[in-house]
């Protein structure tokens, strides 16, 4: 979720550079990502807090009920404490980051 918030803040800076239509498309894309992930927040105890060791591997969390598959999601700062989220959530965030990176290449 931190990544989405930081990304959203970056869009404010991009607004002046981008045309209105492009900015609105980008804003809608991020809002859709956030809305899709709202119901996925769950308490999860990391097995380790070393994200450089885990490298988004499964399993990074204890899930007694074996209900979900998890991935480490320290994608902003490798030294940040490891948080674990559902695999689907992490993959959606990575897809969003890739979209933004490609958009940056088109602009620059």
From Swiss-Prot:
Cystine crosslinks: 44-61, 51-72, 60-84, 74-82
Signal peptide (residue range): 1-19
Locations listed in the record: Secreted
Motif Processing quadruplet motif location, chain numbering: 39-42
Single GO cellular component term: extracellular region
Residues making up the propeptide: 20-42
Entry keyword set: Amidation, Disulfide bond, Knottin, Secreted, Signal, Toxin
UniProt KW Secreted keyword: yes
The organism's place on the tree of life at top rank: Eukaryota
Expressed in which tissues: Expressed by the venom gland.
GO molecular function (one): toxin activity
Family (UniProt): Belongs to the neurotoxin 19 (CSTX) family. 11 (latartoxin) subfamily.
Residues found modified as Isoleucine amide: 107
Keyword Manganese appears in the UniProt entry: no
Record remark on domains: The presence of a 'disulfide through disulfide knot' structurally defines this protein as a knottin.
PTM section of the record: Contains 4 disulfide bonds. Cleavage of the propeptide depends on the processing quadruplet motif (XXXR, with at least one of X being E).
Its job: Insect toxin.
Protein name: Latartoxin-2c
